[in-house]
Amino acid sequence: MLALYTLGLFILTAVTEIVGCYLPYLWLKKSAPGWVLLPAAASLAMFAWLLSLHPTDAGRVYAAYGGVYVFVALLWLWGVEGVRPHPWDFVGVAVALAGMGIIMFAPRG
């Protein structure tokens, strides 16, 4: 159950980080209105708070989180931006998620 909780928390954390960064991108590059910076700031604050909820040491969380971030970012690319990832992108995601699994769930002696 801890693994499902951790994975779900990583996914939610990644979504809040991506939203918090994508909205300023829209403002800077796509002429979105300035008010989009308010939900962006709230999303990034939530991202930082969510990182504090993970059930292990901060450095390990940050290292493992990167693998899930890569996965969610490619889903964002596909679902939000409408760009289909290249097959090699999926290979990279698999490697990143394998690394996340090792970092988070390998037995510690």
Curated annotation (Swiss-Prot):
SUPFAM superfamilies: Multidrug resistance efflux transporter EmrE (SSF103481). The chain crosses the membrane at residues 1-21, 33-53, 63-83, 87-107. Its main location: membrane. It is a multi-pass membrane protein. It is found in: Cell inner membrane. Keywords: Cell inner membrane, Cell membrane, Membrane, Transmembrane, Transmembrane helix. One of its GO terms (cellular component) is plasma membrane. The keyword Cell membrane applies. InterPro entries: UPF0060 (IPR003844). Pfam families: UPF0060 (PF02694). HAMAP family: UPF0060. Belongs to the UPF0060 family. PANTHER family: UPF0060 MEMBRANE PROTEIN YNFA. This is UPF0060 membrane protein ABO_1373. It comes from Alcanivorax borkumensis (strain ATCC 700651 / DSM 11573 / NCIMB 13689 / SK2).
